[in-house]
Amino acid sequence: MKAKTTVFGRILKCYDLPLEEVNDLNIQYEKEKSKLNSFGHRLAGRLDSELEFTHLLGQTKLAKTIGECLNDYIDTIEKLGIFNEEKKLHILSCWVNDMKEGEYNPPHTHHDLTGWSTVLFLKVPEYIDDTKDPHKFKDGMLGFISHDSIGTTWAEPKVGEFYIFEAKHQHMVMPFKTKPKGKIRRTMSFNFVQKILENERRSRYDTWLP
């Protein structure tokens, strides 16, 4: 499994997940989409389709691979001396975003700044690149704001790329224009923690985690 680590005051890892497993998740989502509840009331995004997927994640072919990635991330921060607790992880919430042209996610954090968060790109449409100068900003980028808030690290979306980062790491998703019109960009995200707090109900769906 190919992985890269970026360190700039926050620990960010990106994994390339198997496309056949990504396709399976897309198929499962399309089958269940009409029955899923909106999760938008708990999210920062300015988009229409934000649906909860927590109870279905463990049934996908990606579940085992995702569990391996979570453990690898924790192993990384353990080696860096950042984490020294029992490794027993719990997914608190999972949702899928279908983002249309002009929609976006403003700079935000997750889950009261505790634990870790993820972004997995499931579908990426062809963007219109109408910039005339090479130094101009590209639309549709995923941005991670630096620890000192001076700069931002930008990532160009690619299907199968899975990012894991601290919940307190400010990030954002820029709007885009597509060709042909009407295509969506699909991502899945979830929050996970090492310890369940008293005011948090443990999900009965995360027992598949190793």
Labelled PLM ranges:
Residues 11-13, 184-188:
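Short beta-strand micro-motifs in enzyme catalytic cores
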Residues 81-83, 87-94, 118:
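Hydrophobic, well-structured mid-protein blocks that either form specific transmembrane helices
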Residues 93-164, 172-174, 182-184, 191, ...:
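Catalytic core of non-heme Fe(II) oxygenases with the double-stranded beta-helix
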Residues 1-86, 102-105:
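Non-heme Fe(II)/2-oxoglutarate
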Residues 169:
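A generic "binding-loop/recognition-motif" signal
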